[in-house]
Amino acid sequence: MTASQEPVDQAPESNEPAPAVPATVEALQAELAAVRAELEAAQATVAGQQEQVLRARADAENVRRRAQEDVSKARKFGIESFAESLVPVKDSLEAALAQPDQTLEALREGVEVTLKQLTGAFERNLLKEIAPAQGDKFDPHLHQAISSVPSDQPANTVAQLLQKGYAIADRTLRPALVIVSAGQA
C-alpha cells in the first residue's frame, strides 16, 4: 500500500487522552442512581423553597390586611379624643341656653367659661391658633393675604389680623387671614 492508498477515515493522532468510558453496566447503573439521587435532592430543595415562598406571600398578605384594618380603625376612631374634649363644651352651651332669665353679664361669663373649655380641648389635641401680631413677618405657609395697604409697618409684615388661623401640630388647617403692609406710602 502506498501513501495515497491509506484509508481516509482514520482520525489524526492526538495527545489528549480519550474520555473515560465506564467499563461495565454496573458502573453505568451506579452513576444513574447517583444522578437520580441528586435530582431527587434538588427537587426536594425546590419544593421546600416553593413552600417558603408561599408562606412568605401569605405572611405579607396578612401584614398588608392588618395594616389596612389599623388604618381604617385610626380613621374611624382618630378623632375620638377630640370629640371627648368637645362634649363638655356642648354641655356648657346647652346648660347656658336652658337657664331662664339670664342677665347679659351672666351670659357673657358663661360664654367665657365655655371658650376656656374649648381652648383647653384644642390644646389637649394639639390644635394651635395662628394669630400673628401687627408687625410680624408675613409667612405664606401660615397666613393668607387678603390685601396690601400702605402702612407705618415694614413691607411684607402683618398690618392687621382679620381672622385667626389654626394648625394641628405643624400642619396648617386654616391660614390666618391678614392684611399685609406695603411699607411707607
From Swiss-Prot:
Keywords: Chaperone, Cytoplasm, Stress response
Subcellular location as annotated: Cytoplasm
Source species taxonomy: Bacteria, Pseudomonadati, Pseudomonadota, Betaproteobacteria, Burkholderiales
Cytoplasm found in the keyword field: yes
Residue span of region Disordered: 1-22
Protein family membership: Belongs to the GrpE family.
Chain's role: Participates actively in the response to hyperosmotic and heat shock by preventing the aggregation of stress-denatured proteins, in association with DnaK and GrpE. It is the nucleotide exchange factor for DnaK and may function as a thermosensor. Unfolded proteins bind initially to DnaJ; upon interaction with the DnaJ-bound protein, DnaK hydrolyzes its bound ATP, resulting in the formation of a stable complex. GrpE releases ADP from DnaK; ATP binding to DnaK triggers the release of the substrate protein, thus completing the reaction cycle.
Pfam families: GrpE
Entry coiled-coil feature ranges: none
PROSITE patterns: GRPE (PS01071)
Listed name of the protein: Protein GrpE
Assembly and binders: Homodimer.
Organism: Bordetella petrii (strain ATCC BAA-461 / DSM 12804 / CCUG 43448)
Keyword Cytoplasm included in the entry's annotation: yes
Highest taxon of source: Bacteria
One GO cellular component term noted in the UniProt record for this chain: cytosol
A biological process from GO: protein folding
GO molecular function: adenyl-nucleotide exchange factor activity; protein homodimerization activity; protein-folding chaperone binding; unfolded protein binding
Signal peptide: none
PANTHER family assigned: GRPE PROTEIN, GRPE PROTEIN HOMOLOG, MITOCHONDRIAL
